[in-house]
Regions:
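Acidic donor-binding loop of glycosyltransferase active sites
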Residues: 251, 257, 268-286, 301
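Conserved acidic donor-binding segment of nucleotide-sugar-dependent glycosyltransferases
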Residues: 316-318, 322-329, 338-344
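Carbohydrate-associated surface elements
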Residues: 149, 170
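A short helix/loop element that forms part of the nucleotide-sugar donor recognition site in Leloir-type
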Residues: 177-190
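Conserved donor-binding/catalytic core segment of Leloir-type glycosyltransferases
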Residues: 5-7, 144, 190-206, 212-216
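Short His-centered aromatic/hydrophobic patch
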Residues: 91-97
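Short hydrophobic beta-strand element within catalytic cores of glycosyltransferases
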Residues: 293, 298, 302-305, 315
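Nucleotide-activated donor-binding/catalytic signature segment of Leloir-type glycosyltransferases, i.e.
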Residues: 237-262, 272
Length: 376
């Protein structure tokens, strides 16, 4: 019988960074140990059935599209805990659902673990959300953090520092490995052109606009350079406008959304990976970690990352790549040119990045730490 209740808004079939993090940990918990309580999504039936068939994980869908710690939801969770003799609760994201911890303990939960991501950082900066983080910290046994940046934001609100433990998303270093993507390059008309690749949702914070704006300076030194943007999002129209403004239609290639299985090959199209992320809204919207930097390192590419939030935790500046100010076009273009002009440097940084990913970021490392927090 299951002993762990996972409560989360971030679950499939919808794709996303937090969803991948939660699912990666769930797949590495012993079979039959977990019941999932999550929000409603359309066309979820076959997805939920696969969890039951493959992992003996029962998925229960609430009627709402977004779970909040309302009295109704708390009653549903309490009933699940009592009916299934559940003793452990795992929150896929501490905010906001972790606020329910106090009431779940009354129902019989004896151990509660909550993950944090990027959004808890801005919660920690604004009252009454900062108060909620403090309350969650009081009630849970462990509150995870991604890296030094998220820890520094959370620490002032958590009286018992021993409750803070590091659990970050893992990398499947077998899946994300160096690959020969020449056929893919040929398909997209790139051939052997020096290529920068960026993967991520097309939004302001990810810095695709700055890559386009920095490209004319790159082209002064490397006239045939190409920029490949993988992903989709609301910023696409603005990015199209920048391509037209700088007359870069022959240099910028929009790939759109791709399947997870194809991602390593698309990353491998690049000679350099770049995502100069930047903070927004006076530091309230930041990069929590930037798992895609680590995926690119695992694929053997040197990485240029932005200095937003926790992104520097994912790039060893000067070793696996460079960390730049995501608003500094000169810094962005300078590091791109440096890497595209020096095959030996690219190879050395790429090899160090792959080694670092294997030694420090594999799923086996982080899932072991997480399972220990749940006492399994």
């Amino acid at each position: 019988m299951a002993s762990i209740l996972l409560v989360t808004n971030d679950f499939g079939p919808r794709a996303g960074g937090i969803e991948s993090f939660v699912i990666g940990l769930l797949e590495r918990i012993p079979v039959g140990e977990v019941v999932v309580y999550t929000s409603f999504q359309p066309d979820h039936e076959s997805y939920d059935q696969k969890w039951l068939s493959d992992y003996q994980v029962r998925v229960i869908r609430d009627k709402s599209k977004v779970l909040l710690p309302t009295p109704r939801v708390i009653r549903e969770l309490q009933a699940l805990i009592r009916q299934n003799s559940i003793t452990k609760v795992w929150f896929g994201a501490a905010a906001p659902l972790g606020v329910a911890s106090r009431w779940l303990r009354k129902a019989g939960a004896t151990r509660i673990v909550a993950l944090t991501h990027g959004h808890e950082v801005w919660w920690s900066k604004i009252w009454p959300f900062s108060w909620a983080i403090s309350e969650i910290g009081k009630q849970v046994d462990y509150l995870t953090y991604l890296g030094s940046f998220t820890k520094s934001a959370l620490s002032p609100h958590i009286k018992d520092a021993s409750k803070l433990i590091r659990v970050a998303p893992g990398i499947d270093t077998d899946h994300f490995s160096p690959s020969d993507s020449m056929s893919l390059r040929q398909r997209h008309g790139l051939g052997s052109r020096p290529t920068i690749v960026s993967v991520g949702r097309l939004v302001h914070r990810k810095g695709q606009d700055r890559l386009i704006e920095a490209l004319p300076k790159v082209l002064e030194s490397i006239p045939d350079a190409a920029l490949v943007l993988v992903g989709e999002g609301p910023y696409r129209k603005h990015l199209d406008g920048l391509v037209n403004k700088y007359d870069l239609s022959g240099n910028v290639f929009f790939i759109g959304r791709i399947n997870f299985a194809e991602l390593p090959n698309y990353i491998g199209m690049g000679d350099v990976f770049a995502m100069p992320s930047r903070s927004r809204l006076f530091g309230l919207e930041v990069e929590g970690l930037g798992i895609v930097y680590l995926e690119a390192s695992s694929c053997g590419l040197p990485v240029i990352g932005g200095s937003s939030g926790g992104a520097p935790d994912a790039v060893l500046d000067g070793e696996t790549g460079y960390v730049v100010d995501g608003n500094d076009l000169t810094a962005i273009s300078t590091q791109i040119v440096r890497l595209l002009s020096d095959a030996k440097l690219r190879k050395e940084m790429g090899e160090r990045g792959r080694k670092w990913a294997i030694e420090n970021w594999r799923w086996e490392i982080w899932s072991k730490e997480f399972n220990k927090s749940l006492d399994i």
